[in-house]
């Protein structure tokens, strides 16, 4: 009888064949702009820790206090034995920061979308999303059983055409989009999308994972920066600029109450570890009040962008802390990243199927120094000269 698991080997071989095979690399040391990767000291330009808070002593102390007070884990679903006062304090802090009535915290950002979208729509409904939406937005849409339609990246005219064609055929419609796109760094035209949602009677879910802590007067994200006041669903993560772990959904009190009862990835899973919640709560306070930290991040972004322009490497348009470089096909991009690593820079290649075209993805932190940025620019200059 044939091996029922034999297909796995064939699939792995196909990943190797097309250059899509990936492995993990071990990072050691305190989270920050300098780490050891596979035993080699490098400058870290792949982390989503945009404000440099993950290794901040205040977050570490908050997490340690929570462990001593509550123990290592939440021990159960928050609807059973897993609710702690720090969960509610975090939700109230996030809701206040985001300008919403209430908030619900999940165990990860992925779970937040995987639970929220199927709770809002079902088989009689429509989900419309940007073709470059994060996998958890697309996964949530597919899991819901709703009709799922994608429009070309950033094309609001195509979005409107889809709504004209499809909206009247369905009971409810949910528009899903990232605000800042994780593999490009560009900010979408949220004001136009919000207007289309209003005109066509659609719910709107905005994933602020890469905008929270980075954009807006207080760092609350693109929704704050653009001054959007229309009722919408603000989703985000605690694991990027906030330096901890977990996800959240902010919105009306009624929406949050509904999700608390209907979002399966909240109801049927263990609550966020109290230590992660406490660290995130401290991070919200820091991100909201320490505006110089965001100013440092913006300076680093501008310095690196200018350096890349001077070298002449093609880069994608970006509005955030993510800069993506085009250096060739899959093989060339992989080799380019390998040579950067030899120069002491960790900036791995991002390849299909994660993105449609291979690229070097650089992410910046407020804690990168000017000297670190200049070291990256020097390494890019050296490596690109060997590839030209």
Curated annotation (Swiss-Prot):
Name a Pfam family for this protein.
Aminotran_1_2
Enumerate the Gene Ontology biological process terms.
biotin biosynthetic process
> Per its UniProt entry, which superkingdom is the organism in?
Bacteria
Which parts of the sequence carry N6-(pyridoxal phosphate)lysine? 240
Q: In which pathway does it act?
A: Cofactor biosynthesis; biotin biosynthesis
In the UniProt record, does the keyword Transmembrane occur? no
Q: Name one GO molecular function term.
A: pyridoxal phosphate binding
The job of this chain, per UniProt, is described as: Catalyzes the decarboxylative condensation of pimeloyl-[acyl-carrier protein] and L-alanine to produce 8-amino-7-oxononanoate (AON), [acyl-carrier protein], and carbon dioxide.
Descriptive protein name = Putative 8-amino-7-oxononanoate synthase
Q: Which organism is it from?
A: Gloeobacter violaceus (strain ATCC 29082 / PCC 7421)
């Amino acid at each position: 009888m044939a091996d029922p698991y034999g297909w796995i080997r064939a699939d792995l071989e196909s990943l190797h064949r097309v250059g899509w095979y990936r492995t993990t690399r071990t990072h050691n040391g305190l989270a920050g702009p300098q780490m050891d990767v596979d035993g080699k000291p490098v400058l870290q330009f792949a982390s989503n820790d945009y404000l440099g808070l993950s290794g901040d002593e205040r977050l570490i102390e908050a997490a340690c206090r929570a462990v001593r007070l509550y123990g290592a884990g939440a021990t159960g679903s928050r609807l059973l034995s897993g609710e702690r006062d720090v969960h509610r304090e975090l939700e109230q802090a996030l809701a206040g920061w985001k300008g919403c009535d209430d908030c619900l915290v999940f165990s990860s950002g992925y779970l937040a979308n995987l639970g929220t979208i199927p709770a809002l729509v079902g088989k009689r409904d429509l989900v419309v999303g940007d073709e470059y939406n994060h996998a958890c937005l697309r996964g949530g849409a597919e899991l819901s059983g709703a009709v799922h339609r994608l429009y070309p990246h950033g094309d609001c005219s195509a979005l409107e055409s889809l709504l004209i064609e499809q909206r009247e055929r369905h009971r409810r419609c949910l528009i899903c989009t990232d605000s800042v796109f994780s593999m490009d760094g560009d900010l979408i035209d949220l004001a136009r999308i919000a207007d289309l949602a209003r005109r066509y009677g659609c719910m709107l879910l905005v994933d602020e994972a890469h905008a929270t802590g980075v954009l807006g007067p207080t760092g609350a994200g693109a929704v704050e920066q653009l001054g959007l006041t229309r009722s919408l669903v603000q989703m985000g993560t605690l694991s990027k600029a906030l330096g901890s772990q977990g996800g959240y959904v902010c919105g009306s009190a009624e929406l949050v109450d509904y999700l608390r009862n209907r979002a399966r990835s909240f109801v049927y899973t263990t609550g966020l570890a109290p230590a992660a919640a406490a660290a995130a709560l401290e991070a919200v306070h820091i991100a909201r009040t320490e505006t110089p930290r965001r100013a440092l991040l913006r300076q680093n972004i501008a310095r690196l962008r200018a350096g890349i322009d001077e070298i002449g490497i093609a880069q994608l348009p970006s509005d955030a802390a993510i800069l993506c470089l085009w250096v060739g096909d899959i093989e060339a991009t992989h080799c380019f990243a390998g040579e950067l690593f030899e120069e002491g820079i960790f900036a791995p290649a991002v390849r299909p199927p994660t993105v449609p075209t291979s690229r070097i993805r650089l992410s910046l932190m407020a804690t990168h120094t000017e000297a670190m940025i200049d070291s990256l620019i020097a390494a890019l200059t050296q490596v690109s000269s060997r590839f030209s």
